[in-house]
Amino acid sequence: MILITGGAGFIGSNLVAALSKKTGAPKITVVDRLGIDDKWKNLSNHLVHQIIEPENLDRYLSENDESIEYVFHLGAISSTIEKDVDLILRSNFNLSLSLWNWCTKHRIPFIY
């Protein structure tokens, strides 16, 4: 299985599209918030195994550590007008660090 954070964004959804078109493509799990700016539309024509919210990532990783083969980390708050610094820190730094540590511990390729 391939895990793609930010999989509903522009780059992430194009990666999902490219990977899902490959013959024998592995299952793809997307980590993203779909309600923001109708990002769900970016995935509407692509085959996705599962979609999880970033807040549930740690639990998902612990429950699926045997099946994840690669992690593409494309998720971040990219808004230039976001004013909640704590949210930016949690989403852009803490989540990245946590994911990096998990990948290192489990020897999973981390593509950033």
Describe these PLM feature segments.
Residues 1, 25-27, 109:
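Residues at the starts of beta-strands that form the adenosine-phosphate
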Residues 93-97:
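Conserved active-site region of classical short-chain dehydrogenase/reductase
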Residues 70-73, 98-112:
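Conserved Rossmann-fold NAD(P)-dependent oxidoreductase catalytic core, especially the SDR/UDP-sugar
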Residues 2-22:
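N-terminal Rossmann NAD(P)H-binding glycine-rich loop of SDR-like oxidoreductase domains
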Residues 30-57:
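Glycine-rich phosphate-binding loop and adjoining beta1-alpha1-beta2 segment
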